[in-house]
Regions:
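A short glycine-rich, hydrophobically flanked beta-strand micro-motif that places a catalytic Asp/Glu
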Residues: 72-76, 143, 175-178, 322-330
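An anion-binding catalytic pocket shared by soluble metabolic enzymes
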Residues: 17-39, 67, 84-86, 152-237, ...
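N-terminal leader/targeting segments and the immediate start of mature chains
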Residues: 129-130, 134-135
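An N-terminal JmjN-like helical accessory module and its immediate linker preceding a catalytic domain
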Residues: 1-50, 58-59
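Glycine-rich, N-terminal phosphate-binding loop and its surrounding beta-alpha-beta segment
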Residues: 34-90
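Conserved hydrophobic core element of enzyme catalytic domains
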Residues: 277-389
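Contiguous alpha-helical scaffold segments within structured protein domains
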Residues: 23-46, 96-121, 125-128, 147-154, ...
């Protein structure tokens, strides 16, 4: 029987991922875990960390003779109390691959229908309501408001093509695909630029992104936009709130924690972001990467601050259930090492039907029209990879 373990790296030059319905994928640092089949799986609604530890312990026992280190792939919902459960899986077969360099032909799927939820007027109205709430000065400091774009296509997507395009377009990001059913037709997939947490031994790394501007094809104008983002009081405030919350969550868990005093610029093909690379050392080596992801999630980059007040405020303003959007996706092995990304730049796929989601951080000084535009720029990342316009 093929058993999951940390296998040797397989170069993928001029080849495809060979992703099949039912497979799973998570890429990080130029490599990806590609899982096929399921040795063990669970969909817990509570005690997710304990459930994952139990699955890994069972897999380790089964692989004792081989001396292998099992790897778990997982997806956490935005709201643990919501209708979507966590999804944890130890694949029956696991490959470790590099990004394919194959050149793919143009994608020819046609959009038959598109629906914004809410539309531009509705979204901007929600931003105005969020600003009114923030201006009450009742302790709420930031809200992240999202919207969805539903697409009906003339044919189902070729997931192997889509994931190849996503990975090639975001080589330094986190491309992922997690099945949502046994049919192979339902997926949550995307390419996140944002590292929620990485654990290697006792070393911890977190790289939150908050504060965004669209890039420009002219290099001079692009540089001006980047500098303006770095100098923006509104975006600096939005980012500082996120860093503050992450520090509060990590400080009790780490014996050392290094947090730069100022954010730096991070770019994708379409966007500039403010980012802060936070590094630390765990006080307790028993804390796993998944434990850290659960402790940090959701950060104010996707929810707000304070979380306990922001979550119900968002639920009152957003006319849809987020599900796995703004959740967390990644991997953890039996040693506790792993990497988890914020589940953004994403789509939920059901055959030829797609639901894309994107959000923007709202703080005092936010402009509704600009926030709507920001969500559109974020949606464009996934639309480009899908070859849809």
């Amino acid at each position: 029987m093929d058993m999951p373990f940390c296998p040797p790296l397989e170069p993928q030059a001029n080849t495809r991922i060979a992703f099949r319905p039912g497979d799973s994928l998570f890429s990080s640092q130029g490599q990806a875990f590609h899982g096929r089949g399921s040795l063990l799986q669970a969909t817990p609604r509570e005690a997710v960390g304990a459930c994952a530890a139990q699955l890994l312990a069972q897999a380790t026992e089964q692989q004792a003779e081989a001396g292998a280190t099992p790897v778990l792939l997982g997806l956490l919902p935005y709201d643990p109390a919501g209708p979507a459960p966590a999804r944890l899986q130890i694949p029956r077969v696991l490959r470790r691959i590099t990004a394919p360099t194959v050149t793919l032909p143009a994608h020819h799927a046609t959009i038959l229908q598109r629906r914004e939820h809410p539309d531009q007027a509705g979204y901007e109205h929600s931003v105005q309501a969020a600003l009114a709430r923030l201006n009450r000065n009742d302790g709420l400091r930031k809200l992240v408001l999202a919207r969805t774009l539903e697409l009906d296509l003339d044919r189902p997507l070729d997931l192997d093509d889509v994931l190849t395009r996503l990975w090639q377009a975001s080589p330094h990001g986190y491309t992922y695909a997690i099945p949502l059913s046994d049919s192979g037709q339902d997926y949550f997939l995307g390419a996140s630029p944002e590292l929620l947490v990485r654990r290697e031994g006792r070393r911890v790394r977190v790289h939150p992104l908050a504060g965004t501007a669209a890039r420009h094809p002219d290099t001079t104008e692009d540089a001006r936009i980047a500098q303006a983002l770095l100098d923006s009081p509104k975006d600096r405030l939005e980012h500082a709130v996120v860093v503050e919350a992450i520090e509060a969550a990590l400080r009790p868990l780490c014996c050392t924690l290094d947090i730069p005093a100022q954010p730096s610029l991070t770019s994708t093909a379409r966007l500039w972001h403010l980012g802060t690379l936070i590094e630390g050392e765990l006080a307790d080596p028993a804390i796993s990467a998944l434990d850290l992801a659960i402790a940090l999630h959701p950060t104010p980059a996707v929810c707000g601050l304070p979380t306990a007040d922001a979550r119900p405020a968002i639920a009152a303003l957003e006319p849809f259930e987020r599900g796995y959007f703004a959740g967390a996706v990644g991997w953890c092995d039996a040693n506790g090492d792993g990497a988890w990304a914020v589940a953004i730049r994403c789509a939920q796929v059901h055959g030829p039907h797609l639901t894309l989601s994107a959000g923007a951080g709202i703080v005092p000084g936010s402009v509704p029209t600009l926030e709507y535009r920001e969500t559109g720029n974020k949606l464009r990342t996934i639309l480009d990879a899908l070859g849809l316009h």
